[in-house]
Amino acid sequence: MLLGVISFLPVSALAQCPVSVAAGDGGAPRTKTEFAIGVGGVYTMLEAPSADVALKPRLGYQGYVQMALVFGRFIGVGTEICYSGGSVIASLKDMEFERTVRTTTVDIPIFLTLRFLNIVRLNLGPQFTVMSRAEYSVDGNTQFFGPVYPTVNATAGLGIKLFSNLMLEARYVYPLGVGTNQFMGHEFETTSSRVTAGLTLVF
């Protein structure tokens, strides 16, 4: 199981492996592949405005592997597999009852990367949540809360190179849908955007 955000931390400082060479350019690679791994934190803004249930998300964690195809110096297309874990405190508004809802998520973003000055990277694209699982326990019995995130999201991120093999990255994930969840007999709709931040390492 991958170490678990979030968010699609963007394709970043990555080990580079040329796959083609530009003619007449002194052998400098024009197209190359890049790889990276990273870890970070993720915070979810989870809202259920019409429900009888109050939700308090906690800071979670994420881990990811990335791959990108880079064209020249300024443009790349990439993807990643990101595993994240976290928790939400759910409580009933009309009584003193709360439970910790444990969440696990797997996301696969696909994004366009714009690179500036070999230091800053801007990342934009869709993010697909292929697994979103949340559950809590009542008297030793597991209860299913339902998916925390919709299947399709949009994401934008920024990466800043700290060293030759290390980048600091942040990302915002916006949901393109609503979720339906259940807690102690109450069914309600939720919306869930995310903010992630972390470090990406060249290897």
What are these regions (language model features)?
Residues 32-36, 52-98, 106:
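Glycine- and aromatic-enriched membrane insertion/assembly motifs of diderm outer-membrane
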Residues 156-166, 189-203:
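Outer-membrane beta-barrel "beta-signal"
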Residues 38-46, 82-88, 111-117, 121-136, ...:
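Short glycine-rich beta-strand segments
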Residues 1-10:
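Bacterial N-terminal signal peptides
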Residues 20-22, 45-55, 85-105, 132-149, ...:
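Flexible, solvent-exposed loop segments that connect beta-strands
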Residues 73-77, 119-122, 160, 164-170:
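Repeated loop/turn-to-beta-strand initiation elements of outer-membrane beta-barrel proteins
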Residues 67-69, 112-114, 160-162, 201:
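Residue-level signature of outer-membrane beta-barrel architecture
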Residues 14-69, 120, 124, 175, ...:
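Short glycine/proline- and aromatic-enriched beta-strand/turn motifs that initiate or cap beta-hairpins
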